[in-house]
Amino acid sequence: MIITALIAIAVGFLIGYLARKIIAESKIKSAENLARTILESAKRDAENKKRELLLEAKEEIHRMRTDLEKEIRDRRGELQRLEKRLLQKEETLDKRAETLEQKESFLEEKQKEIQQLEEQISLLYQKEIEELERISGLSREEAKAILLENVQKDIQHEMAVMIKEMENKAKEEAEMKAREIIGNAIQRCAADHAAETTVSVVTLPNDEMKGRIIGREGRNIRTIETLTGIDLIIDDTPEAVVISGFDPIRREVARIALEKLIEDGRIHPARIEEMVEKAKKEVDNMILKAGEEAAFEVGIHGLHPELIKLLGRLKFRTSYGQNVLKHSIEVAHLAGLMAYELGADALVAKRAGLLHDIGKAVDHEVEGPHVMIGAELAKRYHESDAVIHAIMAHHNDVEPQTVEAVLVQAADAISAARPGARREALEAYIKRLDKLEQIANSFEGVEKSYAIQAGREIRIMVKPEIVDDDDIVILARNISKKIEEEVEYPGQIKVTVIRETVAVDYAK
């Protein structure tokens, strides 16, 4: 039974093995057939692709050959055309060369004929000269000299007449043009002018205020006059006091300080000192504002701040009674208008016109003429050479070298010479007072000085650490002697030298 089972199992295994082998062989054969089919298909596709590529290559070769043949034909045609044109040019050149040869031969023949004619003319000319010399009894050189002399005289006379006519015409035209330019400039520049005075009037709320201004034993009025350098005139005029002084800046400081004191009501030396300092600062602001407004009115930009301050100070300076700042603005406008008419640099003319008297803002502090001082200030604050030259030339201290310098000079003369612009008497008076202060300030140890009482007195403040009580008598005598030598004045001048020592301490 067991053996039968084993045999059955063995037979089963054998049958299974044979079945698997048959199946495997069948799959292998199928795979081989498939591979063979794929390989044959690939060979057929490759052959087809090869034939297609060969056909395309043949077509491309044929196309390229056709294009090349066409290009060769075109090139040959172009070469043939060029050859034809070259042949035509050669023929043309040959014809021209032949024509030139003919012309050259013709010119040579004509040249020979001309030479023969020139020789004949030369012979005839020589014969004529010899005949003229024989008839006139003059040589050729002598006759030539006489002829040239006569011609020269005629030409010189005609030239002299012509030059004279041209000069007269030019002068007439220049004079007419100058009148027209100056007339237009004056018409377009309307400047107001008010005569400058040396007094200011301060209105009081009542006459009792006069006593408070004078103070106990006159200490308040003395303090005001000492600190400001002016004369305070208190008379019978109702509800008014008069501030007198030749320096407008000091007078303005005194006026503002006095008005502030009257408004405040507290009037004593300490308060006066405080108000005077405030007034000085306020006047400094007014000076700066006046300079800025002047530059803006004229249309000048880029001025150095120090020049603007100096311009503002000109508001408080006069020249023969004419306000120097208004005069400078007027000169700037006139010079600019005339420069526009002439086609010159109007900006340079206006700038130089505005700054031409800038030296007058400091001429009482610096020695030298205001022209040179102004030129030095302009140079210091980086003004252009053209502006500096115009400032230096406006009083002919140097010869004007530019049109703008001449225009500034002319505008200055127009502004100063017009009717009502200046008054000689006031200027001479102010110069005399200024001279008194300059003499006093020239001595060592003098801190400041003030000419008051219409020039009949000069008060001098000295530095106590330099000048002692014994020296002030000698100083007063020396100043008086120098005033007698250098200043012309009516009557007498009182010289007052003040030495004051103030000690301050604080209780803590």
Swiss-Prot record:
Its EC number is 3.1.-.-. GO terms for cellular component: plasma membrane. GO terms for molecular function: RNA binding; RNA endonuclease activity. The chain crosses the membrane at residues 2-22. SMART domains: HDc, KH. It is found in: Cell membrane. Keywords: Cell membrane, Endonuclease, Hydrolase, Membrane, Nuclease, RNA-binding, Transmembrane, Transmembrane helix. Gene3D superfamilies: Hypothetical protein af1432, K Homology domain, type 1. One of its GO terms (biological process) is mRNA catabolic process. Residues 324-417 form the HD domain. The keyword Membrane applies. It is a single-pass membrane protein. Residues 198-261 form the KH domain. It is an enzyme of class 3 (hydrolase). Endoribonuclease that initiates mRNA decay. NCBIfam families: HDIG, RNase_Y. Belongs to the RNase Y family. This is Ribonuclease Y. It comes from Thermoanaerobacter pseudethanolicus (strain ATCC 33223 / 39E).
